[in-house]
């Protein structure tokens, strides 16, 4: 790890302003319904408290338009954090200003202050320097533990670093370490499994990882763009017709780079995307009938993928194999989740839908790393330089 981390600095009696990612779902009852991201930040928060720091937390929730919106308040998150951590969590219903300064002044060592949703301030997403400076003036050190927003240059994760030193929290450190390994230094054989709806969302990842991977397994709705590009009949399946040439180019590039692209050989098809409808298995070389659409990979494909993954030393998986939210079309995603879980090497699950899928199947702890950032992990795998990582101070050589 070339970046400074929270372990590299003395925190005793220091005020720490920490950017965490508490962008979690809130249920109809107004309570947190999935606290994965909150528990992921706990080790960093607790470490700072143990080291006798005063901890000020910053997070966004949802997409309020730069002004107060009660449904995006962090108040229920403060209550949840207090309940699960046993820490003295104090909620301040302001983002910045005199009330915040006063609350910080009254903090004792070991207190954890959670400020209101950073995106209630119009300056947050613009990386407004005045706002960043106001936050920086509350503390001695900035800790960035919000990998989920690493691909965004906002005031709370990037701006503050212009005024006080910024270091990585434990979650950020783990994300950087694992994603660095699979992007730049993978052990071989290296297999990349991609799914999800659109080729356009994954084009950067495919282009970058074709330089490193030995095999690329493609499932999800994006497979139909590749299959149609090869001249196969895909019925009413989702296809990006404007990306057919691109799919052909990718297949050509893979051939040149000697990367084996493994496409599905069968699919579970139905006439509607809903539970309980008639479904059947279609052999893809015979094509899918009009009016039917592919909604999951089929049983033969599962066997083909299992064979392709057999001796893998590194696996990255990003994107589900089908419409896994509906039980009828979750079989392929579940099978892939289970086969990757058995692999002895380094296994990394990209954030977003793939992370949601492995959580649904109760397999989160079976992998080397499940990323907490959907968009951020994709951009990292594309080889991009992320602003929320660049702004963290480097270790001295």
Curated annotation (Swiss-Prot):
Catalytically driven reaction(s): (2R)-3-phosphoglycerate + ATP = (2R)-3-phospho-glyceroyl phosphate + ADP
Sequence positions that bind substrate: 21-23, 37, 60-63, 119, 152
Spans through the membrane: none
One GO term of the biological process aspect: gluconeogenesis
Binding site for ATP: 202, 294, 325, 351-354
Quaternary data: Monomer.
Protein name, entry field: Phosphoglycerate kinase
């Amino acid at each position: 790890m070339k970046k400074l981390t929270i372990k590299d600095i003395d925190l005793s009696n220091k005020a720490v302003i920490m950017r965490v990612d508490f962008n979690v779902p809130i249920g109809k009852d107004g309570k947190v319904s999935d606290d994965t991201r909150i528990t992921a930040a706990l080790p960093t928060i607790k470490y700072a408290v143990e080291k006798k720091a005063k901890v000020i937390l910053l997070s966004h929730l949802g997409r309020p338009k730069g002004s107060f919106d009660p449904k995006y308040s962090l108040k229920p998150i403060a209550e949840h954090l207090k309940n699960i951590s046993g820490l003295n969590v104090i909620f301040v219903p302001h983002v910045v200003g005199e009330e915040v300064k006063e609350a910080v002044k009254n903090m004792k060592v070991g207190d954890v202050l959670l400020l209101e949703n950073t995106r209630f301030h119009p300056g947050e997403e613009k990386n407004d320097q005045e706002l960043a400076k106001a936050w920086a003036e509350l503390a001695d050190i900035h800790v960035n533990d919000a990998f989920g927003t690493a691909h965004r240059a906002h005031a709370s994760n990037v701006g503050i670093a212009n005024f006080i030193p910024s270091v990585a929290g434990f979650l950020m450190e783990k994300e950087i370490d694992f994603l660095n390994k699979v992007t730049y230094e993978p052990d071989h054989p290296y297999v990349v499994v991609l799914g999800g709806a659109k080729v356009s969302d994954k084009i950067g990842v495919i282009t970058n990882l074709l330089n490193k991977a030995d095999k690329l397994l493609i499932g999800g709705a994006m497979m139909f763009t590749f299959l149609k590009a090869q001249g196969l009949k895909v019925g009413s399946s989702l296809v990006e017709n404007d990306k057919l040439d691109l799919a052909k180019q990718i297949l050509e590039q893979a051939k040149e780079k000697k990367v084996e692209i493994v496409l599905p050989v069968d699919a579970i098809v139905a006439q509607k995307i809903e539970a309980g409808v008639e479904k059947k298995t279609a052999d893809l070389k015979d094509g899918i009938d009009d009016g039917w659409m592919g909604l999951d990979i089929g049983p033969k494909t599962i066997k083909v993928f299992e064979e392709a993954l057999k001796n893998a030393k590194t696996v990255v998986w990003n994107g589900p194999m089908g419409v896994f939210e509906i039980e009828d079309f979750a079989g392929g995603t579940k099978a892939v989740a289970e086969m990757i879980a058995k692999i002895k090497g380094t296994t990394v699950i990209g954030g977003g839908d793939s992370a949601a899928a492995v959580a649904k199947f109760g397999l989160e702890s079976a992998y080397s790393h499940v990323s907490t950032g959907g968009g951020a992990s994709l951009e990292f795998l594309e080889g991009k330089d992320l602003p929320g990582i660049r702004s963290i101070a480097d270790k001295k050589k």
